[in-house]
Amino acid sequence: MKGKPGCRILLFRHGETANSKEVCFNGHYDVGLSKRGQKQFQHWAEILKQESFKSLYSSDLQRTRNSAQFIGQQQGLEPVTFSELRELSFGTWEGMSVSEVERTYPGQMKERMKSVATFQADGGETYPQLQARVIPKFEEIVARHPNDQIIMVCHGGVNRVILGHLLSIPIDKIFRINQDYAALNVIQYYDHEPVVEYIGNAELFSPEKDEIKTAIQ
């Protein structure tokens, strides 16, 4: 039995970024949304306008904060931001494209591909370090809302770490979880036990999609 419903979280990845076509290591680099990224969350705001949410959270980087603000404007909520919810830090790679990293740091991309979870760029983080930063803040937010429906807008790596933690997926396997720009994930707690009800895909978000309507209800 699932037990009594508690906190319900709509966990989004931010919208498409202004430099998305370059495939960059954004990390803590504070890039904004592209026009498409803005439209993605204008669309989500329209879809969710009949829903009611207690609070709205994001990282303090503009790509998540601005994404959250589109929903917040419809809901009358201002995003509460936390630096702990930032993406993995890529250190000296921050803001660089894959080709720039390959030119500037020969051989490091190959090293990263051998073990993405544990690779650490100079001045950056590993995924276990990201997990150690994110999960306590996530659990703190959940504890604040034992019976509320809330929204979180985070990053691809952050969402994978959260979902992997809830599903007991080893950290080196979390990349099996797909997180497109503007993806929706739904987490429902029952007597303090989390159930991941939905792992989303950006291609699915449309008011006509029954799957989305079911997921947010």
Briefly describe each language-model feature range.
Residues 13-70, 121-135:
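Loop-to-helix element that buttresses phosphate recognition and phosphoryl-transfer chemistry
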Residues 21-24, 107-121:
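Short, basic/glycine-rich phosphate-binding loops at helix/coil junctions
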Residues 10, 80-82, 197:
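General small-molecule cofactor/ligand-binding pocket signal
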Residues 2-4, 43-109:
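Phosphate-coordination/substrate-recognition cap region in phosphate-metabolizing enzymes
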Residues 1-8, 88-103, 143-148, 165-217:
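Acidic, low-complexity terminal tails and accessory targeting/binding regions
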Residues 155:
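Short basic (Lys/Arg) and small-residue
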Residues 17, 158-159:
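Short active-site segment of divalent metal-dependent hydrolases/proteases
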